[in-house]
C-alpha cells in the first residue's frame, strides 16, 4: 500500500490522497495507518470490525491445531463455516450461502456467480488474518497513528462483520482513545456488508464525497452530490471484488 501511495504521489503531485479499505481491506488500511502515520490525507474504513481479545486467542489456538493436523496450505471448509456460515445464520431462512453480503439480491447473485468470490480459504490465511487483527487491536499500536489524519467508519447496521454495529463502535472508540482528533462514524440502517453495492449506494457515495471535500484544504464547500454511479443491478458484475 505504501508503494502504491508513493506512486500516486509522484504521478499526481499535490493531489490529496485518501485511502479506502473495505472488509479485509479495512484491516489492511488500519495496519497502514499504524505503520505509515501521516502519509495520507484521510482514511475510509468500510465494513470493518473489532474482535475481542478472547475470540482472537481462541481462533489462533484453533488455527494452530488445524495447521499441525492438516498443514497451512490446504483449503479448509472449517474456516468458511466458522465465518461465512455464522454470518449467514442471522438472515435465516437463507436464499443463498451469502445472504449476509447484501440486502440487494442482484448483488448477492453476482457474488455467488463470480468464480473469484467465496471458496474455502487456507488455514494459513486464517492464522495470518487473526495475527493481523491482533496487531491492529493493540492500544500501543494504535497510539502510533497520526492523530491529525481524519478517519471515517462507514458500515451497514446489519453487517455481521461489524457485529451489527457493535464492533464498528468498538473500533471507533479505540481510535478516539488513541487520540485521533477527527474520527467519524456512520451506520446505515438495514444495510449489510457491501454498502457500496446496496440499492441505496448513491446516498453513501454522496456522504463520502462530502466528507472528503470538507477535509481537503482549500476545497470550496459544495452541497452538490458526485455524479451518480450506475445502478447496482446494471453494474453488479462489473463492480464485483473478491472477498
Question: Where do the protein language model's features map onto the residues?
Answer:
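Short beta-strand/loop motif that positions the catalytic acidic residue
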Residues: 153-155
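Active-site nucleophile elbow and catalytic-triad environment of alpha/beta-hydrolase enzymes
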Residues: 117, 121-143
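Conserved acidic catalytic loop of the alpha/beta-hydrolase fold
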Residues: 1-15
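Conserved alpha/beta-hydrolase "acid-adjacent" motif
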Residues: 160-170
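Gly/Ala-rich beta-loop-alpha elbow adjacent to hydrolase catalytic centers
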Residues: 20-25, 29
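Short, proline-enriched alpha-helix->beta-strand connector loops that line the catalytic pocket
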Residues: 145-151, 181
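Alpha/beta-hydrolase-fold enzymes
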Residues: 29-116
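Catalytic active-site module of serine/aspartate enzymes centered on a nucleophile-bearing elbow/loop
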Residues: 182-230, 234, 240-243
Amino acid at each position: 500500500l505504501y508503494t502504491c501511495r508513493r506512486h500516486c504521489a509522484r504521478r499526481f503531485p499535490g493531489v490529496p490522497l485518501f485511502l479506502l479499505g473495505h472488509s479485509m481491506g479495512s484491516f489492511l488500511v488500519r495496519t497502514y495507518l499504524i505503520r505509515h502515520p501521516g502519509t495520507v490525507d484521510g482514511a475510509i474504513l468500510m465494513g470493518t470490525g473489532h474482535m475481542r481479545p478472547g475470540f482472537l486467542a481462541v481462533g489462533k489456538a484453533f488455527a494452530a491445531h488445524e495447521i499441525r493436523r492438516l498443514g497451512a496450505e490446504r483449503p479448509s471448509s472449517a474456516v468458511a463455516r466458522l465465518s461465512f456460515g455464522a454470518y449467514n445464520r442471522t438472515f435465516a431462512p437463507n436464499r443463498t450461502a451469502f445472504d449476509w453480503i447484501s440486502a440487494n439480491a442482484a448483488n448477492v447473485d453476482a457474488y455467488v456467480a463470480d468464480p473469484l468470490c467465496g471458496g474455502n480459504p487456507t488455514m494459513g490465511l486464517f492464522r495470518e488474518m487473526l495475527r493481523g487483527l491482533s496487531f491492529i487491536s493493540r492500544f500501543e499500536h494504535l497510539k502510533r497513528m497520526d492523530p491529525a489524519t481524519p478517519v471515517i467508519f462507514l458500515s451497514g447496521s446489519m453487517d455481521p462483520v461489524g457485529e451489527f454495529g457493535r464492533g464498528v463502535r468498538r473500533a471507533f472508540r479505540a481510535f478516539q482513545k488513541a487520540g485521533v482528533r477527527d474520527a467519524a462514524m456512520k451506520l446505515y440502517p438495514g444495510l449489510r456488508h457491501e454498502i457500496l453495492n446496496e440499492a441505496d449506494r448513491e446516498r453513501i457515495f454522496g456522504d463520502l464525497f462530502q466528507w472528503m471535500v470538507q477535509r481537503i484544504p482549500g476545497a470550496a464547500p459544495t452541497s452538490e452530490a458526485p455524479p451518480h454511479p450506475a445502478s447496482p443491478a446494471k453494474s453488479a458484475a462489473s463492480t464485483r471484488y473478491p472477498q
